[in-house]
From Swiss-Prot:
Residues 39-59, 81-114, 140-165 are annotated as: Disordered. This is MICOS complex subunit Mic25. It is a lipid-anchor. Residues 154-165 have a biased composition (Basic and acidic residues). It comes from Rattus norvegicus (Rat). A motif (Cx9C motif 2) lies at residues 244-254.
């Protein structure tokens, strides 16, 4: 009899509410805190919802998870709910639920702490990067400002050296051309002297040969007296030249006679 009664007392049936969640347990009375805790357990835990990625730039908001509390279980008296042996299984299930909730809360708390620590480290790293970038920029600007005069002086010195080299090269080229032109001029003068000497020698030889082949002749003027008279007549009678016509005829007759003779 006792074993059959205890077996019947251990049978606990469950019922579903309108939202298909376990709400009513027949054979055991649950306190309001246990019911609320079971409602919370039916929803996905914060540890399951939150899965922070390894990306350094994203910040995942962490939902606030209430701290787990030990549920208070009110066990009815044997006179109301039956034998005490029938109510032995329910507290164990409640403690298991609260223990799972406690572990979920600890996990979410650890995740929250890790995320907070990661965000703090990320902010610190970003601050350090900003400081390093600022220092590098300042150092670069300082180096550029300091190197500008040096670069300018170096550029001017290089330009001066280049112009000096070009001037020396031009002077050397002019000197070489001057020497070349002087040599050419001396050669031309020597050739001209040789040509003049040769031409003079050839001219004298040709003149000597011509003198030896051509006999000299004495030439006397023909009718020189008449020529003098004609010139005097023309000078005295500039406007009456016809008066000198007789002298001109006599001169022509004299020349014709000299040719025939």
């Amino acid at each position: 009899m006792g074993s059959s009664e205890s077996a019947e007392a251990r049978r606990v049936s469950f019922e579903m509410d309108e939202e298909e969640r376990v709400r009513v347990l027949q054979g055991i009375r649950l306190s309001e805190s246990v019911v609320n805790r079971m409602k919370d357990c039916s929803q996905p835990s914060a540890g399951e919802q939150l899965a922070p990625g390894p990306g350094p730039e994203c910040s995942v908001p962490v939902p606030t998870v209430p701290q787990p509390t030990i549920p208070v279980l009110t066990v009815p008296s044997p006179s109301v709910c039956g034998p005490a042996e029938g109510t032995y299984k329910a507290p164990q299930g409640d403690f298991k639920v609260s223990r799972a909730e406690n572990s979920d809360g600890q996990q979410s708390s650890a995740v929250k702490e890790d995320l907070k620590k990661f965000q703090q480290e990320q902010l610190a790293v970003q601050d350090e990067l900003v400081k390093v970038a600022r220092k590098e920029k300042e150092a670069t600007e300082k180096h550029l400002k300091a190197s500008l005069p040096k670069k300018k002086a170096t550029h001017e010195q290089q330009q001066s050296d280049r112009l000096t080299r070009e001037l020396k090269n031009r002077e050397a080229e002019l000197s070489r051309r001057d020497t070349f032109y002087k040599e050419q001029q001396e050669r031309i003068q020597e050739k001209n002297a040789e040509l003049y000497k040769l031409s003079s020698q050839q001219f004298h030889e040709a003149a000597s040969k011509a003198e030896s082949t051509i006999k000299p002749r004495r030439v006397e003027p023909v009718c020189s007296g008449l020529q003098a008279q004609i010139l005097r007549c023309y000078r005295d009678h500039l406007h009456e030249v016809l008066l000198c016509s007789d002298l001109a005829k006599a001169y022509q007759h004299c020349v014709s006679t000299a040719r025939k003779g």
